[in-house]
Regions:
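Short secondary-structure junctions
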Residues: 143-145, 213
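Solvent-exposed N-terminal domain segments of exported/luminal and surface proteins
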Residues: 6-134
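A short, polar/proline- and glycine-enriched secondary-structure boundary/capping micro-motif
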Residues: 50-53, 167-168, 212-213
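Acidic, contiguous internal or C-terminal segments within carbohydrate-active enzymes
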Residues: 146-149, 154-199
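A mature extracytoplasmic/lumenal domain signature
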Residues: 6, 43-45, 158-162, 205-207
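Long, contiguous hydrophobic alpha-helical segments, chiefly transmembrane helices and signal peptides
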Residues: 1, 30-32, 38-41, 124, ...
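C-terminal globular interaction/adhesion domains in large, modular proteins
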Residues: 89, 135-142, 149-154, 158
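Extended acidic/polar, glycine-enriched regions
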Residues: 1-25, 199-214
Length: 214
């Protein structure tokens, strides 16, 4: 038998090792990270644009255990820099490309980068229903709700637009994604409401041709 005593005290302060944010300024991305790795998923503004990106994006981190995602977005999306790049494209495309590379999160600036190409795939671990042997891609989330935001855990709840499964257009997917400090992997709980019958589920780890690079 164990005896536990609850008493008032001062909570211990922890350095932030897991955190994330909704980025309306970047077509509704939700991006999150811990001390080892970072991820993002895509939202309704990107879907409205017509770009096809269904899965999770994976960003590498090294040489640091501190949060880096906020700084990467700030560099990539800086309006003054974007305006300068646009101007240079008219007169000096090479200089424009060099300036872009100097601020882009697709280039390693010493602590990692976004080197993973998602596109119209399941990306890095996204789940999808597969009735009759065909993947039904979930596209981008419809709503997001951040439930935990550090210092040691990030959790977000994503609800998706209804899917059409074998003629039934009422199937709604909900995901609760959790990333803890010290883990390279998310824990994701996936629920499909209104699914009428048992249906296979697949998860994507996409390898790109021709050499199988991720």
């Amino acid at each position: 038998t164990a005896v536990y005593t609850i008493q008032a005290g001062t909570p211990e302060n922890f350095a932030v090792k897991a955190c994330g944010r909704y980025y309306p300024e970047r077509v509704d991305d939700v991006a999150w990270e811990n001390d080892l790795v970072a991820f993002r998923t895509y939202g309704p503004a990107l879907q409205k644009s017509g770009e096809r990106a269904f899965g999770y994006d994976v960003w590498t981190k090294y040489n640091t255990t501190e949060p880096v995602v906020e700084a990467r977005y700030a560099s990539e999306l800086n309006p003054e820099t974007k305006a300068k790049i646009a101007e240079l494209k008219k007169t000096d495309p090479k200089a424009a490309q060099e300036l872009y590379k100097s601020v882009s999160y697709h280039v390693d600036h010493g602590n990692g980068l976004d080197c993973y190409k998602v596109g119209p795939t399941l990306g890095g671990g996204t789940a999808a229903l597969m009735p009759d042997g065909e993947i039904v891609y979930p596209y981008c989330y419809a709503t997001q709700d951040i439930l935990d935001n550090g210092p040691l855990r990030f959790t977000v709840k994503l609800v998706y637009n209804p899917l059409n499964i074998k003629g039934d257009s009422t199937v709604v997917e909900t995901r609760v994604i959790t990333l803890d400090a010290g883990s390279h992997l998310n824990k994701t709980v996936v629920v499909y409401d209104n699914l009428k019958e048992t249906t296979p589920v697949v998860a994507g780890i996409v390898l790109h041709e021709p050499d199988g690079a991720v």
